[in-house]
């Protein structure tokens, strides 16, 4: 369980947080440069990263539900007073991203941005459900850790800069591959 948790935390903090700005950058490259970059391949890579992340997250939820001795907490959250947030979390984190198995949806930038936003919202609903049910059950706010964040504006700047850099790297990779294919055929 710790391995799954570590993998999802690494993906969430290092890659997934920057998907929305990265997808916007890919969309801008698609609009501004028409057929210059292989944006469909980049979108396909992003889609499969989202699908793999969703499968790992789903396995983590299933493992927690079946094998952890506190599995009652999962069913209690799904049927308790904050059930709406739990089901929003499942919809955003597990159900909606699996629609990317359909190629027609996978190649639409707007839909990918929507799915990325829904997944990020699902992650926040997950934290909300865990913290609020803990406070509701224990009536003790000391048990919930409060995270210190950077100022909001700097945080947003970092997200967009790193998202744009990731998009440029991804598009550059496909551009270099295309150049090597052309060079090897001549």
Identify the residue ranges that each predicted region occupies.
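Membrane-interface transmembrane-helix boundary segments in multi-pass integral membrane proteins
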Residues: 73-89, 141-169
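Membrane-interface capping segments at transmembrane-helix boundaries
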Residues: 31-35, 171-186
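Transmembrane-helix bundle segments that line or gate the permeation/cavity pathway
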Residues: 123-134, 174-180
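Membrane-helix interface motif
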Residues: 62-71, 126-140
